[in-house]
Amino acid sequence: MYQDLIRNELNEAAETLANFLKDEANIHAIQRAAVLLADSFKAGGKVISCGNGGSHCDAMHFAEELTGRYRENRPGYPAIAISDVSHISCVGNDFGYDHIFSRYVEAVGREGDVLLGISTSGNSANVAKAIEAAREKGMKVITLTGKDGGKMAGSADIEIRVPHFGYADRVQEIHIKVIHILIQLIEKEMVK
């Protein structure tokens, strides 16, 4: 009944991944991002991650697997996803939704830390403001974006962009794979 739809969805996902893999710059960007994060951890820094909707879940997933574990038992790494509902509702109410992430970065971000901003469109105003706040704090910035990078294009030290212009779920599928690879590489870098 739905076999053709299932095949089409899986084929489109495979095609999106194949297109992402064609660009060697993506491979290099992932490696550079992992080394940047591991270097921050080794120097006493942390990563703060943020995003909206599914990207918010990805930001939490990234932090959870760094503080918890991925594939190997090892010490936890310093990672925070901006996901505190009290903070988000307070800042959203008092300052506006565009400031929910930047206000947190202002409060806990430090020079030597890294911000991971995730936005499938690259147009999330609250993530863009978090990038600005991170810059003011002397933090490094990594972005996971999609399409043409949107308003966030060119705003990061390292941008990992999925050049897919269809539905956001295809971009998210690559984002979660990139997140898992980042964690795997960080684990390798941390034992060097």
Curated annotation (Swiss-Prot):
The lineage of its organism: Bacteria, Pseudomonadati, Pseudomonadota, Gammaproteobacteria, Enterobacterales. Binds 1 zinc ion per subunit. It catalyses: 2 D-sedoheptulose 7-phosphate = D-glycero-alpha-D-manno-heptose 7-phosphate + D-glycero-beta-D-manno-heptose 7-phosphate. The keyword Isomerase applies. GO terms for cellular component: cytoplasm. The gene is gmhA. Its EC number is 5.3.1.28. Its cofactor is Zn(2+). Catalyzes the isomerization of sedoheptulose 7-phosphate in D-glycero-D-manno-heptose 7-phosphate. It is found in: Cytoplasm. One of its GO terms (molecular function) is carbohydrate derivative binding. This is Phosphoheptose isomerase.
